[in-house]
Structures are given as C-alpha cells and as structure tokens.
C-alpha cells in the first residue's frame, strides 16, 4: 500500500475518555489484507456484531485513506490504579475459576469490567452531580455481556465477575453494585471500593488471546458506527493533520494562565497545585488545577485518539471524542498542518434554540442583552446558560435567570416547563430536544464544509478551524442555522 504521504510526519492518536482507541496508519481498501487483529475499545463497553467485518470492505471509498489511526501500543487498556496487582496477588482461585477456567483470562476479564469505571477518577473531581461525585456509574447489562463474552445474551460470566469484585480480597472490596434497577429508566450502578476509588489510573497490556479477541470484536463495531456519521467521518479525516502540543508546551501555557488569573468557561479559576494536595485550598471546588487538566490530556492522548462515539437519543446524538473531552485551554494549543486553530461558535446558541423550540418571541438573543436587562453580570449569565434549560423545574426556579425569562419570555418558559411535566423523559426531554437540534445543525454545517474541502474539529456547538478557513466556516454556519429556524449568528 502507498504510504508516501506519511513520510516525515509524526502523528499519534491517543487513548481516551473511556479507553476508546482507533487503529490507523495504513490505507484500507476492499482488497487489502491488513491485519486488524488489534483492538479498539468502544466507550469502555465492547460491542460486537460479526456482520460488522463487512463494513471494512464496503462503502469506504471516501474514508478508507483517512483511517489514520496510530497506536503506540495496540493492546493497552486503562484500568483503576492498584487493581492489576491486587487481582494477581490476592483474588482467590475459586472466584477466578468461577469466571473462566483459565486464571489469567479470568483476571483480564475482571480488568476489562473495571476499565468501565476508570473514568470515574476524572468525573468525581469535576462534577456537581452527587451521584457521580460519589463514584457511581450506570452500566447496561446487555452491553457488559457483549463486552465480556462477545454475546449480548445473559451469561454467568458477568454475574461471576461482579460477585468476585464485590466479595473482594483481604485488601477490601474491589467494586460494588448499588442493586437499584428500573426497567427502561436506568441500569444498575457500580463504583470502585474505597481502596481504589480516586486512586488514579494505570495502563495494562492485555496478554491473553481470549481477551484480545474480545477487544478485536469491538474494533469492527467502532468503525461501523463511525463511518455512518458525517461528523465522525469528518473527524477521521482531520485526525491525520492534527499536531498535539508537547507536555512542556501545555505546562508553559498553564502557568501563563495561572499568572494571568484566567478562568475556565465554567467560571473556575485556573490554578496550580504547586505540589500541594487539593485539600490545601479551601475553595478547591472553585478552581481548575492545571496538573489535573494535564492528567486528562495525557489520558486522552497517550496511546492514540479516541474513536468518535455517537451518543444515544438522550444526548441528542452528540459526538464524543478526544477533543470534546479535552480541557479547552489545552485544546486551543492544537495545530492543524502546523497552523494555529481558532474557534467558531454561535452566539448564545441554546437560549436561541429554546426560543425556536418553545415559542419564544425574541430573536438573536445575546448573553450581553440578558445581562443588561437582568442586572446579572455577563460571566454568570454565560455559566448559568450552560445548564439552565436542562434542569428540573424545581432547580430552574432556583436559578438567577428565571426572573428574566418569567418577565420577558413567559410563554416560552410555560411551554418548556409543561413539556418537562408531561414527558416520559421528565426534565431530561429539554436537553434531548435541544441537543438534537444542535447536532442537526452542526451535522449539516460539517457536511457542507466537507463538500468544499474544509475539515474541522467538532466541539459540540463550536468548530475549530485554521484562521484561513474561519470566514468560510462562519459563513456556512450562518447559512445553515437560519434554515433550521434558529435566530443567532456565528462568530
């Protein structure tokens, strides 16, 4: 295969939020015999459908040359710190043999399950959700079955793994289940035991053939979901042109932001731990520490880029990848073909989407306008708008924005609240509809940009592009959004 276009370029894509990996580096065509035996982990939950192998040989003319998916080590997964050692040294043989007749396979299956909980280390540090703050995470039984056995059907393997981890070792329980299940609403939740909760992350290289095959099956599922989505196809094509900052560059930028007392989009003061523990800072919850941001960056990129993941209906189909999950101040250091990237985004997109969906009277609302009319400082308006419409009715009435909307957009507010009260999805229906509208808009924008040869990094309601493409990108964004009935402008 022709690899001349790769010469002289150092490109690596990395491990991600949920250890999702992409394989890359060779051009794939229907006639290639490329070895695809290494794995991709999809959202820490491994999916498999044997028919997915056909996807590799069909319909890839426009994306095959861009499955640029480089690994440093193709068999790495991310697991909670200390779990590898404790499973090997202290888990009793009888519990392992209940899982699989091969002890080494049983241990790796336990690690595979635990890899689903790895990202709680990061989520616990940066969430206001009480459930996530305590380390809990919902995992669907059907997907766990597929991850751990290659089949969606119920099996004793999953149950025996959970039982073994809950029983634990002489060092304590390794993971626990909350035992709360509601059909059609939420699955069982799991979290790490006290000895492993918030203790960090480590890399583990899978060694057994059986577990490698499970990982391999996830590879085909990941690709099949990626190539069917316009945003994902765009991302696959752009990854090969991306240059990540070095750790030294990230650290230097972080120190600059600390010195200048900059804040994140959520209003947190960018700070440095400076070798202190977080407990040293009385207002730690109001700070974003550069050391933790660098940990996330390395987690997302130290072994390749994440396979873009299409969210479910509850997320409106939003796409997650290494860049949507990356701290924004680090993402701003990324380059495309050696060129600095800048962001193009819509002005007050979600308030204007709410106007469109729920019968609002105003058009082209801005944060500045709301700040002026409400007397709330503009930074607080921006931060509160990140979550205002998605809250429960009770929490919306606690917001400092509710008075503005009650006074200026009462019909819109009543329509929105009525839907929350009557929908089977309750208050979550609002975010579902608004995210769906956002995704529809961004999908059309990206498709139109790709037609003229422009590829971008997707960040939910914003796009990152080179400075030379900015004018065309904002023009396309403005053309598309008007056709969707949302009155705002891109800048």
What are these regions (language model features)?
Residues 469-491:
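Polymerase palm active-site segment centered on the conserved acidic dipeptide of motif C
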Residues 90, 99-101, 128-157, 314-429, ...:
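Helical catalytic core of nucleic-acid polymerases
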Residues 166-182, 455:
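A short, conserved structural fragment
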Residues 2-6, 14-16, 32-106, 112-124, ...:
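Conserved catalytic core of nucleic-acid polymerases
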Residues 181-376, 460-462:
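Acidic, glycine-rich two-metal-ion catalytic cores of nucleic acid-processing enzymes
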């Amino acid at each position: 295969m022709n690899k001349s276009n790769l010469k002289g370029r150092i490109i690596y894509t990395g491990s991600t939020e949920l250890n999702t990996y992409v394989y890359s580096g060779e051009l794939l065509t229907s006639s290639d015999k490329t070895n695809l035996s290494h794995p991709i982990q999809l959202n820490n939950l491994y999916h498999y459908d044997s028919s997915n192998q056909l996807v590799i040989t069909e319909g890839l003319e426009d994306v095959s040359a861009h499955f640029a998916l480089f690994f440093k080590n193709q068999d790495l997964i991310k697991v909670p710190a200390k779990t590898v050692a404790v499973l090997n040294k202290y888990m009793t043989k009888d519990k392992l043999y209940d899982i699989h007749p091969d002890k080494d396979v049983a241990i790796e299956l336990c690690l595979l399950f635990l890899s689903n909980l790895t990202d709680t280390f990061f989520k616990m540090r940066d969430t206001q959700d009480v459930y996530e703050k305590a380390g809990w995470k919902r995992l669907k039984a059907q997907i766990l079955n597929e991850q751990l056995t290659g089949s969606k059907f119920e099996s004793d393997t999953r149950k025996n793994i959970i039982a073994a981890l809950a029983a634990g070792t002489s060092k304590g329980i390794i993971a626990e289940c909350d035992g709360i299940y509601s059909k059609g609403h939420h699955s069982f939740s799991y979290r790490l035991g006290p000895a492993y909760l918030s203790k960090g992350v480590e890399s583990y290289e899978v060694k057994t053939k059986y577990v490698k095959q499970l990982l391999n099956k996830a590879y085909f599922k990941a690709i099949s979901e990626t190539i069917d989505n316009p945003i994902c196809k765009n991302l696959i094509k752009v990854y090969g042109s991306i240059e990540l900052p070095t750790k030294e560059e990230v650290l230097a930028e972080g120190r600059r932001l600390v010195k200048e007392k900059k804040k994140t989009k959520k209003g947190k003061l960018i700070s440095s731990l400076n070798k202190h523990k977080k407990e040293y800072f009385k207002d730690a919850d109001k700070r974003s520490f550069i050391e933790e941001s660098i940990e996330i960056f390395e987690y997302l990129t130290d072994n390749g880029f994440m396979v873009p993941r299409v969210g479910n209906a509850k997320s409106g189909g939003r796409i997650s990848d290494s860049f949507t999950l990356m701290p924004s101040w680090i993402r701003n250091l990324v380059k495309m073909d050696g060129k600095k990237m800048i962001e193009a985004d819509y002005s007050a997109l979600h308030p204007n989407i709410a106007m469109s969906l729920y019968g609002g009277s105003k058009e082209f609302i801005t944060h500045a306008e709301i700040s002026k009319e409400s007397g709330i400082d503009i930074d607080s308006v921006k931060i509160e708008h990140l979550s205002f419409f998605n809250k429960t009715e009770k929490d919306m009435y606690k917001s400092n924005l509710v008075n503005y909307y009650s006074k200026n957009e009462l019909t819109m507010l009543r329509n929105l609240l009525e839907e929350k009260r009557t929908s089977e999805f309750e208050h979550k229906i609002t975010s579902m509809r608004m995210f769906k509208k956002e995704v529809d808009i961004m999908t059309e924008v990206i498709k139109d940009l790709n037609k003229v040869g422009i590829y971008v990094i997707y960040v939910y309601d914003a796009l990152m592009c080179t400075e030379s493409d900015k004018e065309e990108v904002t023009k396309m964004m403005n053309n598309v959004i008007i056709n969707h009935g949302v009155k705002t402008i891109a800048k």
